[in-house]
Amino acid sequence: MEEYKVTLDGPAPWGFRLQGGKDFNMPLSISRLTPGGKSELAGVNVGDWLLQIEGDSTASMTHIEAQNKIRASSNKLGLVLSRFAVGANHPKGVHTPESQGRKYNFAPSTALNKIARPFGSGTPPPDNSRPVQVTKPVAYNPPPTSYPSSQMPQGQLQNGQKSRTVSNVSGKDTTDHPIPPAPSTGPAVRPPWTTDPTFADRYAPDKTTTVMTKHTQPATPTPAQSRNSILQAAQVPSSGDKTPVCSQCNKIIRGRFLLALGRYYHPEEFTCSQCHKVLEEGGFFEEKGSIFCPCCYDARFAPNCAKCKKKITGEIMHALKMTWHVPCFTCAYCKTPIRNRAFYMEDGKPYCEKDYEQMFGTKCRGCDFKIDAGDRFLEALGFSWHDTCFVCAICQINLEGKTFYSKKDKPLCKTHAFSNV
């Protein structure tokens, strides 16, 4: 991280919007810059973390406390920010414009959802949602024909199935030695604002967002994959290999056997821990050392939908600290599934951005732009105004807190009270 200090000359506006805070469980950062504003000219970028305001650390500040600290500065505003020193795709001073601004929400904001956790893993991944890994066991039948030691084939090709999991499951001869599975490596984690151009807009403090994950079912491999998995497993054993012992009954295995999760099984004893169905041909899930068939795993561990109360076995919607079917979490007005887009809460009901803007949005009478959450505004002449937009229609002097006159719904100062508009 590269830290830098910025001093902005007053008065307000300072030309930036904040997001995050202690109450949102995320650090304070810059979510939006006014084109040509003081912050943009000073080299501040969208996504930069705000470390200090006027020498005070922001680590323990809520969003409102940070706003009040900034408002208290009148002549100068000193900030300490940080940004990633590498990976910047835009030159200094050039910023990608945002497609849409934030909405003004008159109801208390809902805290952002935390990162989704996939269902079906013994230890949930720390920072991303990954599909449940499913393993398919395969069985190997020894050939009925016996060969002399000099003519023993180097590999027997039999029917089987390969799984899409880190755990290698294969069938072997009784004297074969298992090949340890190779560890898998995941992609390097990058900050969300470097990979998602809409991160700042979707995670504005007044918005509520959703996260979707996938509850994956076992996949059926192709015949080519099956042949490859058996070919790698069925190698001629050395004379020093030991006879496998079943992990279920602790007896020596004679003939066919299964190898799953690093243990040997008789095919008929590799069963679901709940319904005791033989899992030789189907996929299975491993949870806390127990083995389950897909049906029992869904019934026992799959989450319930907050609306219909049924089990969720496909896409999972995470919103409002609950889980939903995607078709069950919809806009209260247009009934369209919100999916992974931002939404707004009004009277306890979710609304998509389009409908919320039409039904509850507020615009400034002076500039015709939306009044964002955290903006200072006032009510006058039956309209809402930004505090910097309520000016005399002729001389543009600010009229906040001053006596004014109106003509044709336009404010006028004392000097131009009787002028033509």
UniProtKB/Swiss-Prot annotation:
Query: GO cellular component terms?
Result: adherens junction; filamentous actin; stress fiber; Z disc
Which ranges of the sequence are coiled-coil? none
In its UniProt entry, what is this protein called? PDZ and LIM domain protein 7
Asked if the keyword Zinc belongs to this entry, the reply reads yes
Gene Ontology BP, a term? actin cytoskeleton organization
Specify the domain of life of the species encoding this protein. Answer: Eukaryota
Give the principal location in a single coarse category.
Answer: cytoplasm
Q: Point to the regions of Polar residues compositional bias.
A: 147-172
Which function does this protein serve? May function as a scaffold on which the coordinated assembly of proteins can occur. May play a role as an adapter that, via its PDZ domain, localizes LIM-binding proteins to actin filaments of both skeletal muscle and nonmuscle tissues.
In its UniProt record, a GO molecular function of this protein is: metal ion binding
Please list where the region (Disordered) is annotated.
Answer: 115-193
**Protein location:** Cytoplasm, Cytoskeleton
Which residues belong to any copy of the PDZ domain? 1-85
Q: Which gene encodes it?
A: pdlim7
**What does the UniProt keyword field contain?**
Cytoplasm, Cytoskeleton, LIM domain, Metal-binding, Repeat, Zinc
